[in-house]
């Protein structure tokens, strides 16, 4: 299908409308100009893991398992922990000594909720603020089918200081994370409701219901005190956000979801279970890559494990990998010889998975006619909420 702006639909500025004995110069039209280059969309990804990394001094007998590279600037050498990132050293910047000023007073076990918010939970009765990924999601709202992709190994929201999501809406409320690969795939790439007319009626019904809710809430607000008015305003704002989502869903309902190649499908292991960490984490990364590749969303977060105790799904990963203790216990042994190596091996596992994701992003063009790659157009934050316990 031809598009305005393509070479086959450009007019020279000297073109004329010609009639019988008449030649009328055309006014400047958009189609006369050459097609302006379309800027490749930017993307944001945030990947988080808890409980610190293996910190080893140069004189330590386990120095090779120290997380931070040797040297500074561009002249550095990866230790065993981050060696899998060697192929991407030109695209990777390793930063240390950073912290959220407002989070320094919070206990090390309680800082996972603040990775993307930097919020002082203690002074706000454990009520968070909006996460940076959701600020970006609002910026891109409507440009993609989904504003963001929020994932975690444990799924849901968890509880304050033990959150199982990285993402918080504009009111500081946690956004439930998805953790079932098949569920994520169906939402982003599945056929959806086979009866489009029924789906359209459902969306229309939802819109009508929201109109009634807004009307009733507006009447109620006028009879409330100042504090309750603030609460109802917050509620109304939430309803408006739902309205916007319904409106966007109506706009996208007749647009087919992106198709995937056989090779893309073969890489996915949608039956991957969190009891097999290597397959599970790889699949979550692959889903993130596909979401970016198809421009289904431009914002994604993945919490590999939470700050919860040893019973969490992600917390069991080291044991399932045969590295040693559960993640919490592993972190507490960081300053012991055996513990330093075990924690370093966990760090390396994470780096291997991350490196594979970077490979996929680097080998995928940012667009059909683009010389850039997805990695070129994506800011990726990969890190944790504390150095050591």
Name the predicted role of every residue range.
Residues 1-387:
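Ligand-binding pockets and gating/stacking loops
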